[in-house]
Amino acid sequence: MNLGDGLKLETELLDGKTKLILSPYEHKSKVSVKMGNKFKIAKCPLRTKQTGHTLKSTQNTYIGNENLSQKKISTLDTSQAKPENSRLTFSPSTDKQYSEKDSVRVQKEISPTTSNIRKIINTTGTCPVAKQKPCKKNPTAETMNSGLVCLTQDQLRQILMLSVNQGNGSVCLTETGEEEASQDSLHLINIPSQPKDVNDTGFLQNTEAASPVTSEHEHVHRRAQEAFQQCEQKAATENEWKPADIFSTLGERERDKSLLEARRAQWKKELDEQVALKKKEKEASQKWHNPWKPSDIECEKSQVHDQSKEARLLESPCSAIKQEQQRKWIEELNKQVEDDQQRKAEERMIYSKGEEHDRWAVHFDSLKSHPGSQSRLSSQLTHQHLESLCVSPDTQELADVNGVFTPPPGVQAEPSEKEQRARPVLEMAVSHGPKTNFLRSMTALLDPAQIEERERRRQKQLEHQKAIMAQVEENRRKKRLEEEQRKKEEQELELRLAREREEMQRQYEEDILKQRQREEIMTLKTNELFHTMQRAQELAQRLKQEQRIRELAQKGHDTSRLIQNLGAQVDYKAFTTISSSHSDPEETADTSTASPKKDTGVQTDDVNLGIFNDALPPCGSVTEKGIRNISSPEISAEFSGQTDIRKENQELSMNKGTNLDKENSWHNGQCNQYRRTEKQTKLMKKCPKKPAWNINKPLKKYVPASAKYPAHLQKEKEEKKVQRQMELLHLVERNNPENLSQNRGISPLATSHRETESESRLHLIKKVEEPLKTPSVSKERFQTSPAVKNRTQQTQSNVLHLPLKNNDYEKETLTLGDGHTKLSDEMSEPSHFIPYVRTNEIYYLDPDAPLSRPSTQDNQYQKSHDCAREQELFDSDHIRDPLLNPKLVKNRDRQQAILKGLSELRQGLLQKQKELETNLIPLTANQEDNFSSSF
């Protein structure tokens, strides 16, 4: 709960100034809390309007900000159920926001004592009531009508004095004598202005209609006055004037709750009776009012239906003539209602069009006078001044533009007063009509010439727009024609493609049929050729066996059993040929069906057969394919014949090698041969098409992937391989301790000797250079820094002393090494840089030598050393070695520094060696590639 919730603020006029004060606090009862939860009224900022017709000196800060439609329904209920502080706020100003929404909003806070005020207000319904216009049929009309009453000046003064006595705030009546005389009956809702004659006639008719029920109203009025006097006496005793102090109202509680509930029930009952009386009065007044007026037709229709129902209930024996008259009357009324609605809709449309046109004309042509606009302006002024006479801005109900005026009936002020006030306003508006207004429009400073120029521009722009529209239409038409043409071409293309597809399909089917016929013919020819070859082989084998028998007979062997075996074998072979001839059609069908698979599957035929098939015509290919083996028809006949001949030769050689006396061994060999042939025939019957795997030689040699590279890439690869091997050999040689001592003992004589050897091998280098012709041998590749040149020179010269196992490889590497040496010698002649080679030559320095290092620019440094001195060092290396003989060292610090540097160099060298051995990437090759790419 926020600080300040529940406080009520008021404005009070003191010495002509508005001041904000706290109103006295009253505790709500449980019923009021429940009803407050049902109908919550939100708080909004204070809104005060000071006008000339102000009737109030205080204004409540509780201003309802609730949904308007919900407020319509709950106006009567909140007036009956909420026991809160009630003030009727009278203000002549208007609220345009609510007038457009057809809303009735009453600003209220109802207390237990002012519910008596509502009763008095409701009992005063017998006063002369102005004529009401028929309203639209909405569900809240009766509720609104029953909750709206009129007050006389005496009753209003009585209510205000009662509220002052009860301590709910001071109400100062600031109205003048002129206002008291003019405002005899102020109504609580905002009613639009009506013509004078309508108000006068309605007033007279309603007073006449209200006279029959006066006696009932007097009875109700008398009871209400008695209750009001009792309540006033009790309020005078209980509620005394309390100052508007926040501390004087804290902790005050409501008493006599049971009495309050009884009063509220009695008031509600009386209100219900009064609502019923008002409803009857309204029906009576509407029944005898002018039924043919177009504005009253809508409500009269409902009244006619109610009257007809009542008549049927009261007078059961109705005549047919009366019913016919009523039906005609209802039809005529319906027709009039429809015509009136149609006419109003048309007038509304015409009026809205004319109003829009006049508004734009006034806005753009301020030099012309528009009487229609002036009349509308005067009517708007009249409306504003008439609305200023209304009591509260929260109770306005103005008609919408699209609807009929629907003021709630029974609560209207006297028309004579309104007409008296509206007449001077109308005269003032008419008097101001011909005068020009002071609003400056867009064309106020333009002369007629500029207006004409604008008109010409507008016409030109319209013509331009028409031309653009015509052009757009033309483009659209062209696009449509192009689209139609394109669709037509696409359809023709689709038809042509369909015809071509059908033609191709038909041709394909014909080709397949021809291919099948050709394959069938080929299979037939193949089978015939196969049988002829088989018969020829059998005949040749029989002739060989007969020749063998004759040879054995000449040598004196017994050949009777061989002759018997030969006859049995001939009979068996004849039987097998007959059976195979019977199975020829089946084989042809099998081969014809299996031929497509044979084309796509693994080929087990002879490779030479495929070559012949490509080269020879179909007949030749048929003959070649027809040559088959007994065990497998797919094996070529030539190959099978060769294998059979080879087997027979082996058997003959074995028979010749055996002893002639041992007839049994020879007989067993013949029996084995017979069994072998019988087994082959059985296998052929079981699976005549069993493929023979791994009997054909491959068509091409196996070519490794490295040999499939282009020629120049293969050359580069070979060169890099040779160079890499050379570098690895150099590294191995340098790290070899034997070669280190040799490297240490190199003299200028040895280098000159190597140069002569390299010159002698120059011819071999040229022979190698001619087929290679790669950048690795060219001079541009070796145009690198002097350090790399000398290191390459040293490593390549060391290759000459390395023993190689492979003689061919030795020749190649030596020739390449000599070539590199020659080229590097030629290019390193003008160089002046002496490299620092990582060797252990530092161990053999003379201790007596100066500490300072000689200049690297001295070309004669190495030549200055005497050959005899170097030879002496090499001879006495073990004796004068500082590591072996530490007594020779005079400068220990220098020796330690040298040893430390040597250890670091050795570690680096070993690490480089490991990297090169593992990655097989030589250091010098990378350096040469980098230098060549930079240049």
Curated annotation (Swiss-Prot):
| Annotated Polar residues bias | 76-96, 590-602, 783-794
Task: Point to the regions of Basic and acidic residues compositional bias.
Answer: 473-491, 752-782
Assigned keywords, A-Z = Cell cycle, Cell division, Cell projection, Cilium, Cilium biogenesis/degradation, Coiled coil, Cytoplasm, Cytoskeleton, Disulfide bond, Microtubule, Phosphoprotein
Q: Where is this region: Mediates localization to cilia, centrosomes and spindle microtubules and the interaction with PCM1, CEP290, CEP104 and CSPP1?
A: 567-935
Q: Where in the cell is it found?
A: Cytoplasm, Cytoskeleton, Microtubule organizing center, Centrosome; Cytoplasm, Cytoskeleton, Microtubule organizing center, Centrosome, Centriolar satellite; Cell projection, Cilium; Cytoplasm, Cytoskeleton, Cilium basal body
Coiled coil ranges (UniProt) are 462-555
Where Phosphoserine occurs along the chain? S366, S595
Highest taxon of the lineage = Eukaryota
Q: Which Pfam families match?
A: CCDC66
Q: Which InterPro entries match?
A: CCD66 (IPR039183), CCDC66_dom (IPR040467)
User: Positions of the region Disordered?
Assistant: 76-103, 470-491, 577-602, 738-794
Q: Which residues carry this modification: Phosphothreonine?
A: T114
**One CC-aspect GO term:** axoneme
Describe what happens without this gene.
Mice lacking Ccdc66 are viable but display degeneration of the retina. Initial formation of the retina is normal up to postnatal stage P10. Malformation of photoreceptors develops around P13. The degeneration progresses slowly until 3 months after birth, when the outer nuclear layer is reduced to 5-6 rows. From 5 to 7 months, only a thin outer nuclear and photoreceptor layer with severely shrunken outer and inner segments is preserved. It is associated with impaired photoreceptor function with early visual impairment detectable 1 month after birth and progressing slightly until 7 months.
The record's GO molecular-function terms, alphabetically, read:
microtubule binding; protein homodimerization activity
One biological-process term from Gene Ontology?
mitotic metaphase chromosome alignment
Tissue expression, per UniProt? Widely expressed. Expressed in retina by rod photoreceptors but also detected in outer plexiform and ganglion cell layers (at protein level).
Q: How does it assemble?
A: Homodimer; disulfide-linked. Interacts with CEP290. Interacts with PCM1. Interacts with ARMC9, TOGARAM1, CSPP1 and CEP104. Interacts with CDK5RAP2, CEP152, CEP192, TBG1 and PRC1.
Its function, per the record, reads: Microtubule-binding protein required for ciliogenesis. May function in ciliogenesis by mediating the transport of proteins like BBS4 to the cilium, but also through the organization of the centriolar satellites. Required for the assembly of signaling-competent cilia with proper structure and length. Mediates this function in part by regulating transition zone assembly and basal body recruitment of the IFT-B complex. Cooperates with the ciliopathy proteins CSPP1 and CEP104 during cilium length regulation. Plays two important roles during cell division.
Q: What is this protein called?
A: Coiled-coil domain-containing protein 66
List the gene name: Ccdc66
